[in-house]
């Protein structure tokens, strides 16, 4: 009965997100910087979504998946960053239990879906480069929608399992979360009972949603690189390399930071190091996506200029 009472008290009182409380002078600087990056992220990813929809030349599987990725980035930042900004600005760092619950489900579902979608995009790139004559037959709209749906549903499914298991743990009045967002690993640490099963389940999920997609991307990238080197046309070869390089850059930054967070032993890094890496993963990686794609892929740059020219009624060279 005592454990139940303490657990209920934690649920009613909510949690205290310590965030960057140890760096009071840095919090205001981070607030301004993160606010700017947040606005750039929303603007950049919304631009990619609109351009992909408005420009007929971009009505292709690659840009269909890219618009889904941008939509994911937009939703993730909108579910995480506002709470982070409040945490940095307000002296009171509390978050209601219900708010933490919504925060946990949204961020975990969107983040898990993001882990699957780049692997789907690599599949599209593999068919486009290695099987160009069969591309339109294989990558039809129904398959693209099915692959995108698979990514979304897998993210939602793993979230229902992991988040539910985590929130069933008794916290025994422990309210201080040494992070700036509600995440499964940090909430598991608050539990006052054994968490071996939760940690094992989280590790297995991390393998499935991180190592498996990364392995698939690396293998497909190897086949793509081999096929690109055999292209005789320098223009086509440069175009293929540019597209694949952009995708690999985004993938490397995204998976590199998240693997560091979820698969590195907790004892091998300091708690502050984990916070700053998490901050980079949460804010910076999603801002870089539109920047990298628009700078590296000529079709996106050309379509963006065309859409802006129509909107502004001017001729943009």
From Swiss-Prot:
Membrane topology, record value: Multi-pass membrane protein
Keywords: Cell membrane, Disulfide bond, G-protein coupled receptor, Glycoprotein, Membrane, Olfaction, Receptor, Sensory transduction, Transducer, Transmembrane, Transmembrane helix
Pfam families: 7tm_4
Transmembrane segment boundaries: 29-52, 61-82, 104-123, 143-161, 199-222, 240-262, 276-295
Glycosylation site residues: 8
GO molecular function: G protein-coupled receptor activity; olfactory receptor activity
Disulfide bonds: 100-192
Gene3D superfamilies tied to this protein: Rhodopsin 7-helix transmembrane proteins (1.20.1070.10)
Topological domain ranges for the Extracellular compartment: 1-28, 83-103, 162-198, 263-275
Recorded superkingdom: Eukaryota
Cytoplasmic side: 53-60, 124-142, 223-239, 296-317
Gene Ontology CC: one annotated term: plasma membrane
Keyword Disulfide bond: yes
UniProt entry tagged with the keyword Iron: no
Classification via InterPro entries: GPCR_Rhodpsn, GPCR_Rhodpsn_7TM, Olfact_rcpt
Cellular compartment(s): Cell membrane
A Gene Ontology biological process term: detection of chemical stimulus involved in sensory perception of smell
Family: Belongs to the G-protein coupled receptor 1 family.
Role according to the record: Odorant receptor.
Protein name: Olfactory receptor 2G2
Lineage of source species: Eukaryota, Metazoa, Chordata, Craniata, Vertebrata
Gene name of the record: OR2G2
């Amino acid at each position: 009965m005592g454990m139940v009472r303490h657990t209920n008290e934690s649920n009613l009182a909510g949690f205290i997100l310590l965030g960057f409380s140890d760096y009071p002078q840095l919090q205001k600087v981070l607030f301004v910087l993160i606010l700017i990056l947040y606005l750039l992220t929303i603007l950049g990813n919304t631009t990619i979504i609109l351009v992909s929809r408005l420009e007929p030349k971009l009505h292709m599987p690659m840009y269909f998946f890219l618009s889904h990725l941008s939509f994911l980035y937009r939703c993730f930042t909108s579910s995480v960053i506002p709470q982070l900004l409040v945490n940095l600005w307000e002296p009171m760092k509390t978050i209601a239990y219900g708010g933490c619950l919504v925060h946990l489900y949204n961020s975990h579902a969107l983040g898990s879906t993001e882990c699957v979608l780049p692997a789907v995009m690599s599949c599209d790139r593999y068919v486009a480069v290695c099987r160009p004559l069969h591309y339109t037959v294989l990558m039809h709209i129904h398959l693209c929608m099915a692959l995108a749906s698979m990514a979304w549903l897998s993210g939602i499914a793993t979230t229902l399992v992991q988040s539910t298991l985590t929130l069933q743990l008794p916290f025994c009045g422990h309210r201080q979360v040494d992070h700036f967002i509600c995440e499964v690993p940090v909430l598991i640490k608050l539990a006052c009972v054994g968490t071996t099963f939760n940690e094992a389940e989280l590790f297995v999920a991390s393998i499935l949603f991180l190592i498996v997609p990364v392995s698939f991307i690396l293998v497909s990238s190897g086949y793509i690189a081999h096929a690109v080197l055999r292209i005789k046309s320098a223009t086509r070869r440069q175009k293929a390399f540019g597209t694949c390089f952009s995708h690999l850059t985004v993938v490397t930054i995204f998976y590199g930071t998240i693997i560091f967070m979820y698969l590195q032993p907790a004892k091998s890094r300091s708690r502050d190091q984990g916070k700053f890496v998490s901050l980079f993963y949460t804010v910076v990686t999603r801002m870089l996506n539109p920047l990298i794609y628009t700078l590296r892929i000529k079709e996106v740059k050309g379509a963006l200029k065309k859409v802006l020219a129509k909107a502004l009624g001017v001729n943009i060279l």
